[in-house]
Each structure stands twice: as structure tokens, then as C-alpha cells.
């Protein structure tokens, strides 16, 4: 009897793992894998692809970023439409977003295409809010993603796209993304303070 219960527990545990590895979560995993690939191409392109014109490397990196960004839209859409939201997905999706954006900004900064101050501000905000959300969760405060947070992500993606392609206006879009990134970060802090006052 004990052996049978243990066996059923193991099967149910494995089933839970496979249920968590649904299509939206696999897309998030795919996005996580694309982030270091894009960073590697940006930083090492001049040394590795010596026979290919450097502008083609920009296109390759931009293509990787676009593919990753598209999967970001689809994993959320599929999770909502097919009722495939999981706890694993709630962790993987924002993690993949941050890895993709930060890998792109760091690579662009190292190439001299993105202001170091702008990148540092985005980095500090992302890491601070990630840690702050852990504190919020420990205090039982749950804040849903705001419209400012969604607009922030879109603005970051546009800034990265323009900077990758070296198009005019990339630096302006970067600083707009910085402003929205900081604003959405303050929203989390104000929401936490408001929730704690109510409690």
C-alpha cells in the first residue's frame, strides 16, 4: 500500500512537471536561450564574422530580437486563451523578458551605441523591482502588471530595435524607455505603500 502511494505520488509529480512545460512556458524557455545568443553575436561579431559585412550582423541580432519579442506576445496570448497559466510561467515570462532586454542593452552599450547611464538606470530599476516584488510577496501584497509596465516593455523593445539597426532616433527612444522604466518602478513602490497603509 505504501509503495503504491509513493509510486502514485511520483507519477503525479512528474505529471505536474510536464503540465507546467506547456507551449507558453516552452516559448519562454526559447526566449531565455535567445538572449545570450544575441548578446554573444553583438559583442563578438567583429572577431568571429570577419568575412561578413558588419551590417549583416546587425540584421541577424535584430532578427533574433524580433523573434524573441514575437514569442513574448504569443506565450502570453496562448496562456490566456488556452487557460495554460502556471506558476512556472509566472516566473519564466518576466525572467525571459528581463534577460532579453538586458542582454540587448548591455551588448549595445559595449558597442558604444547605447548610453551607459541609460543602461545602468534600466539595470538598477529592473534588479531593484525584482527584489522588491519578493518583499511585496512576503508581505502578502500582489500588484498586477500595470499599463505603464506594459508600455515600458514596448518602449524598451522599440529602443533596442532602433539601436540594433542604428536608425536615427534610437537614443531618443532609449531615454523615453528609461523614463517609462523608472515611472513604472515608482508605481510598484506606491502600490506597496498604499497596500501596507490599508492593512
Segments from the language model and where they lie:
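Alpha-helical transmembrane bundles and membrane-interface segments of multipass inner-membrane proteins
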Residues: 2-199
